[in-house]
């Protein structure tokens, strides 16, 4: 698939100053396999609860970061067997971090159903960079 410069018809995920083309990431995984990502059959989900709470915030409390999803879609149209996509984030200082760039609806459903694990792909730094879209394009 050839992407337009603006990724207008691509599925993308944006978080603060970063944006990724999910279509590109999936294409790289299909084409390059382990050069693009490492498959993990059971990734722990409980650490994501802080970003995707199962219940609304208590009155008087504010969440600084919250991933917004369509709850009805998450519970009725997601397939939990499809691996989520996780991208490494290299900070200016300190250890690398990671972020879910595709699969937040699946994470929500899994957590609502009491599951603690889902399969995931961890992109390599190469695939993360190839999938990243400059935020000023969109």
Which stretches of residues belong to each language-model region?
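Short alpha-helix boundary/capping and kink motifs at helix termini
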Residues: 35-99, 111
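Intrinsically disordered, low-complexity boundary segments flanking structured domains
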Residues: 1-5, 25, 32, 66-76, ...
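Short amphipathic alpha-helical surface micro-motifs
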Residues: 20, 27, 64-69, 101-103
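Surface-exposed, charge/polar-rich loops and edge strands
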Residues: 1-41, 59, 116-138
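A short, basic-hydrophobic beta/loop patch
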Residues: 81-138
């Amino acid at each position: 698939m050839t992407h337009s410069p603006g990724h207008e018809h691509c599925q993308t995920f944006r978080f603060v100053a970063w944006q990724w083309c999910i279509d590109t990431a999936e294409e790289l995984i299909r084409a390059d396999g382990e050069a693009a990502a490492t498959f993990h059959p059971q990734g722990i989900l409980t650490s994501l609860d802080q970003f995707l709470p199962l219940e609304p915030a208590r009155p008087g409390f504010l969440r600084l970061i919250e991933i917004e999803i369509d709850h009805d879609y998450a519970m009725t149209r997601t397939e939990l067997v499809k691996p989520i996509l996780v991208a490494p984030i290299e900070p200016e200082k300190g250890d690398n971090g990671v972020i879910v760039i595709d699969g937040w609806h699946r994470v929500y459903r899994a957590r609502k159903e009491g599951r603690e694990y889902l399969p995931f792909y961890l992109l390599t730094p190469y695939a993360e960079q190839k999938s990243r879209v400059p935020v000023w394009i969109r």
